[in-house]
Amino acid sequence: GGTSVLDTFRSYVYHSDVSGSAEAGLEVQARDSKKSEYVNDPVYSGSAGGFGGALLNGSVKDSKVTNLRKVNGMNYTGGFIGHLGKSGTVDLDNLGALGDLLSAGAGVMDVFGSHVDRCSVEGVNEGFTVHSNNTIDQKNKSEIAGGFTGYADLGRLSENKVTGLKQVTSGQIAGGFAGKTTFAYLANINLDSELVKGLVTVVNQILKALWLDELQKGQVIKIDLGIIEIDALYDGKLVSLNLLGLDIKVGLAEDKSLATIYIGDSKIEINCSESGTIDEESLKNEINISLIKANRTKIDKCTVTGIADGYDVYGGGAGNNANGTGQYGIAGGFVGWNNEGLLENNNMFFADVIRGAKDLTGPFTGKSSLNSNWEFNDVKGIEGNE
């Protein structure tokens, strides 16, 4: 039917291994570089990684690289994957009747990042190095290097590990685990949009069923939004569903007075009326804020561990005896440039020298950007659980 256009065509790689030889180890090198422009958001090829060069809107889980010695790239370079990129999933111009519902959610549907969970990189005994240096084009370049990934563009990374890291170097941005993170606020969503109305309808229908104790564990609920019908699953505590690519979970407290709603990474708690429903205006406001915050790089429960002598991170062309230079000479022990990414419960061990340009170097992040007018945002909120 018409809802088939909502299917996300992703590349999936599960339970896969890449292993270098016991003696020489694995070496990977990118030899070319090109720039592509996407509405003032350039993307560069020349990516390199021990497992993959670039992953656009894909998922890799439970996979590993062992005996890695060296990864050299022109631009985005990482020990595991150089470029964790985003891509569009739906052409809104060809949706017909669904266009009205999706138009306000264009930011939700157009932008999906890649997911990497429970993956690992392990170096040879003497450690592995990651190096980003564009030798082809010194003007059109984006040199970003990280021990696990170079450029995590809206990527979601959870429970990944780097061990045996020796050095990360870059002509521009360098980080022990990731080079750069990004965000994409969905600020154009209107409170009266069909997307928000749809979410309000979904949440209230689920809460009413929970309030009336009508649901059994494992039961599938069908919610009709007119244009599309959505299936939701009850696991005994929460009702889970996916609306237009948004993961949503809804629960009700035992005394039925408080509803808890999860939209992506955001958690909403709001009081219920005696009939089990929530005031629509209050819910609209809460949902709108959650949607605005929905799209950002998230790195959670990840670890980078250096060799016994410690790992070095050099940004901006820095070296053993020189500091980095330039406005992008950024170096951080865990992330080079955290551009409003969400970093939670991460660890770094055996970091030695972190060196970049003046005021762009730090033990955890080299630079943290937070240019936001939203009162719910602060640096502690996005890097608070280090």
Tell where the protein language model's regions lie, with residue ranges.
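Surface-exposed loop/turn motifs in large extracellular/passenger domains
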Residues: 1-386
